[in-house]
Amino acid sequence: TRVRSSAASDVYKRQGMNIRKITDYFRAGCKEDYNRRIGVEIEHFVIKEDNTNATYEEIAELLEAVFGNEQCEYEQRSLLGCVTMEYAISLEPAAQLEISIFPRKTVQELEQIYEGFLKRMESYLGLRHMRLETCGYQPYAKAAELPLIPKRRYEYMDAYFKHTETMGIRMMRGSASTQVSIDYLNEQDFVKKFQLAQMLSPVLALLTENTAVIDGIPVKKHIPRTEIWNHVDKKRCGIVPGSMSEEFSFYTYAEYVYHVPLIFARDHGIIMPTGEWSAAEHLSLIHISEP
């Protein structure tokens, strides 16, 4: 009985320690007022002139031509992205091309960098009879027919979402989005912005809606992407439980994160699938390091 009690106590202490480390990670993200910045990520579909999706191999060749091998990043010889001084390029599950512009002081700076990226890509795309399209969902292909790029993490995500709900394939293979990152001053500022973002989310989704078809079928309802996300994984999508209450904090958010299924985790540098286990349940793999 003492051994079991001691073991349970050790697990409880370790869980508390890990939650505090996640809390410390959030706190380490606080920025001084003079140093606050904004970042943006924009995902694109790479489409050929016959309106078919460019293949992973074609997009990899395109990026190597544009950025050169020295700026490209690989996983087991497969190109996964590129990095410059101003932004990073990555490939999403079905080869959607994402630019992540490093945080800047103003929206105008982000706009200038993005326009520079488009101009840099323009001639290379033209030579290959390709173009970039920015819309919320794959405009021509069916998601289930699009293969995953050779990235281990996406294999684990794909397998996991097949067992949660019905829209994981559409989310991973068929969708694209624009994401914005905004700095916060302190915990109070974080909570205010987090809650406001969740309240504005459906409004912004409606205002920026640009999805005309889903898997070849014309869309008849508004915000179809939201409908997709509503049926991906209820444990990790939607409004964070308790986040709109007055008690919401770094710590309560850390508790939520700690108990959401991981899907995968790193073990000595190797990405391992964890299925539906959360960090709290997978203590053999998860010992969170200091931020």
Which ranges hold each PLM region?
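Terminal catalytic/cofactor-binding subdomain
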Residues: R14-T166, G174
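A very general structural signal that marks isolated residues within well-ordered alpha-helical segments
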Residues: R4, D10, D50, L185-E187, ...
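Single conserved hydrophobic/aromatic residue that forms the stacking wall/gate
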Residues: T1-Y12, I286-P291
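Loop-rich catalytic cores of soluble enzymes, especially ATP-dependent carboxylate-amine ligases
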Residues: Y137-L285, S289
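Flexible, glycine- and charge-enriched loops at secondary-structure boundaries
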Residues: T1, V107, E111, F190
